[in-house]
UniProtKB/Swiss-Prot annotation:
NCBIfam families in the cross-refs: L12
Keyword Ribosomal protein: yes
Protein name (Swiss-Prot/TrEMBL): Large ribosomal subunit protein bL12
Subunit structure comment from the entry: Homodimer. Part of the ribosomal stalk of the 50S ribosomal subunit. Forms a multimeric L10(L12)X complex, where L10 forms an elongated spine to which 2 to 4 L12 dimers bind in a sequential fashion. Binds GTP-bound translation factors.
GO biological process terms, semicolon-separated: translation
UniProt keyword terms in alphabetical order: Ribonucleoprotein, Ribosomal protein
GO cellular component: cytosolic large ribosomal subunit
Length: 121
């Protein structure tokens, strides 16, 4: 008896963020693939135009000394539940992807005020 795609998606939806991250890592190792988006090689031309980055990723690098404040800030930024926010705070990782520069700076300020260290990429 094999599972349908819908059953697999439902099972994944019930998992916590940390469990899903572990699942992705296991799939990468099992099948020898990477979940990272492929990087397209830029055409080397004399008139290469450098575009300003419009989408940013905010990454939590350290929760700082006050973990409780950092967890509260992570919950406020991501909308995650308490357990998922705690797991993300302890493990570090991506808080938000594809946000504007203003939004990224706002998140960075909020997290820094909570004592956490974040990086905007």
């Amino acid at each position: 008896m094999s599972l349908t795609n819908e059953q697999i998606v439902d099972a994944i939806a019930e998992k916590s963020l940390m469990e899903v991250m572990e699942l992705v890592k296991a799939i990468e190792e099992k099948f020898g693939v990477s979940a990272a988006a492929p990087v397209a090689a830029a055409a080397a031309g004399p008139a290469a135009v450098v575009e300003e980055q419009t989408e940013f990723t905010v990454v939590l690098t350290s929760p700082g000394a006050n973990k409780v404040a950092a967890i509260k800030a992570v919950r406020g930024v991501t909308g995650l539940g308490l357990k998922e926010a705690k797991d993300l705070t302890e493990a570090g990782g991506i808080l938000k992807e594809g946000v504007s520069k203003d939004e990224a700076e706002k998140i960075k300020k909020e997290m820094t005020e909570a004592g956490a260290t974040v990086e905007v990429k």
